[in-house]
Amino acid sequence: MVACTPPPRPPPTPPVNPRTLRHLFNFWPPFLATGVHVSHISSDWRHARVELRMRPWNRNYVGTHFGGSLFSMTDPFWMIMVMQCLGRDYIVWDKAAEIEFVKPGKGTVQVQFKLDQAVLDELTEATASGQKVLRWFPMDVVDAQGDVVARLRKQLYVRRKRKAGGSDSQDAAVHP
């Protein structure tokens, strides 16, 4: 009897570096068309700065920033930053999001993402036994004067990857 062996797995895709990802985002059609510009992603994935520039084609009916653009400028960054910092042993997904429009946005607005070691330690500890964690990350979109235009929260699902043959009984969520 001949044993059937599975074909070898392709090598994992090498992780992209922050500088390359920043350039890719700036030419990504959804960001390019809406005026979103990623101005900085730190080399350690702990900080990012994103701007939304007012353009004739991205104004809403009353001449201010379209709310969907304010929301989309914040979309992938927390997930990517946490995923890159925790590494390949973790699953990280966007789970939920909330936005509160505080005042009309005009001109260039920006949002900053800062991920500190304490948050990463908290996530690592909370997922050590294989449980999923649902963690909220707040951020403010501000105008050139520093006034808050919108307050947002993104919820991430974070879980340590199961080893082969693991059970699905570890789905109780921890909410830090």
Region roles according to the model:
Residues 57-77, 91:
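Hot-dog-fold acyl-thioester-processing enzymes
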Residues 1-51, 167-176:
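Non-catalytic linker/capping segments at the edges of enzyme domains
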Residues 81-118:
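Hydrophobic beta-strand-centered segment that forms part of the acyl-chain substrate-binding groove
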Residues 37, 98-100, 112-114, 140, ...:
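Residues located in well-ordered beta-strands
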Residues 44, 55-58, 76-78, 117-120:
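Short, charged/polar surface micro-motifs in flexible loops or helix N-caps
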Residues 33-38, 95-101, 122-124:
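Short structured motifs
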Residues 34, 46-48, 93-97, 107-111, ...:
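A generic structural signal for short beta-strands and their flanking turns/coil linkers
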Residues 4-10, 15, 105-106, 116-176:
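HotDog/MaoC-like acyl-thioester-processing domains
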